[in-house]
């Protein structure tokens, strides 16, 4: 995806939790807007969430663009929480974007700002280590109280 013109390094990293059951879905979330309709707020992540969501239903296309999408549901409660861009369309690839293909509906998840290693400052995308989602045990095993705050 085209990210050379746009910079997302100053965006806050969020922990994304399911609104229905409070399950942690991702420790690498970012607030975003839908490329095809910038009035729609959502969250996104760059790494496939592990042991948190799975595909549900059939692939579909939107009326606004030609991206091929598939819904994702929370593994704990079964509610649809977002979608995965299976095949992005050329207009979305050429747009200013963050390179993320995993999207979460703002009506289905809530975010918690993730702190840096000092535990004081909000972690920014420019300082985020490039590691696998599944190896980030400290963040994925956060307490229920942390997710509820």
Curated annotation (Swiss-Prot):
Signal peptide start-end: none
Localization of this protein: Cytoplasm; Mitochondrion
Keyword Metal-binding on entry: no
Conditions for induction: Up-regulated in peripheral blood mononuclear cells following Epstein-Barr virus (EBV) infection or following transfection with EBV LMP1 protein.
Gene Ontology CC: one annotated term: intracellular membrane-bounded organelle
Organ and tissue specificity: May be up-regulated in malignant colon cancers, compared to normal colon and colon adenomas. Expression is also elevated in other common cancer types, including breast, lung, uterus, and ovary.
Keyword field: Cytoplasm, Mitochondrion
Function noted in UniProt: May play a role in the regulation of cellular reactive oxygen species metabolism. May participate in cell growth regulation.
Family designation: Belongs to the FAM72 family.
Subunit field text: Interacts with UNG.
Misc note: Highly homologous to GCUD2 but localized to a distinct locus.
Protein name per its UniProtKB record: Protein FAM72A
Organism: Homo sapiens
Phylogenetic classification of the source organism: Eukaryota, Metazoa, Chordata, Craniata, Vertebrata
Name of the encoding gene: FAM72A
